[in-house]
Amino acid sequence: KNVIVAFKDNASIIEGEYCVDILLNNFTNQFIPVNDKFNFSYKAETHNFPTGICPFPGAETGVGGRIRDTLSCGKGGDIIAGTAGYCVGDILHDLYQINQYNDYYNNLIHNKPLTILIEASNGASDYGNKIGEPIIQGFCRSYRGDFIDCNNDKNTNIRIEYLKPIMFSGGIGKILNKNNYKKNLNYGDLL
């Protein structure tokens, strides 16, 4: 009922409220108070493979792409705050130097889980801070489960783990009600 834009454009838009905000007047280059209706936008995406290979810039560009989409929603929105989440494999082998895991993790093309958590968190925060969007909350999951498959005679060990990391980036923004939708362009229109 309150959804204005969903599953099209670069981000979703939901119904907001009238409020006073300070906006830049593009003609005078001065900030002016504006009493208008502002709606909320939300965008989320993952940047898993780049973050697994090179955590700091992988997470940085994940946040950057999501911020770009928030800014380009409709005829242009503003960013407010972000969230970041990480799901990685077992971090105990790094923390306690458990040798039985080292050969396995050294053969992966991804970084070790603890390295991903630290460097990806730094990268996501770095990009948001540089552009003026704080990451105000997030989540972290580290999981490895070892089970015995009792469905066969061999009682095979089964391991369940995040071998490929998940890097989640989400953010809220605001957009003027009159900017919810892009205009249709014709050939020769000036942008």
Q: Which residue stretches match the model-derived regions?
A:
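Glycine/proline-enriched, intrinsically flexible loops and inter-domain linkers
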Residues: 1-191
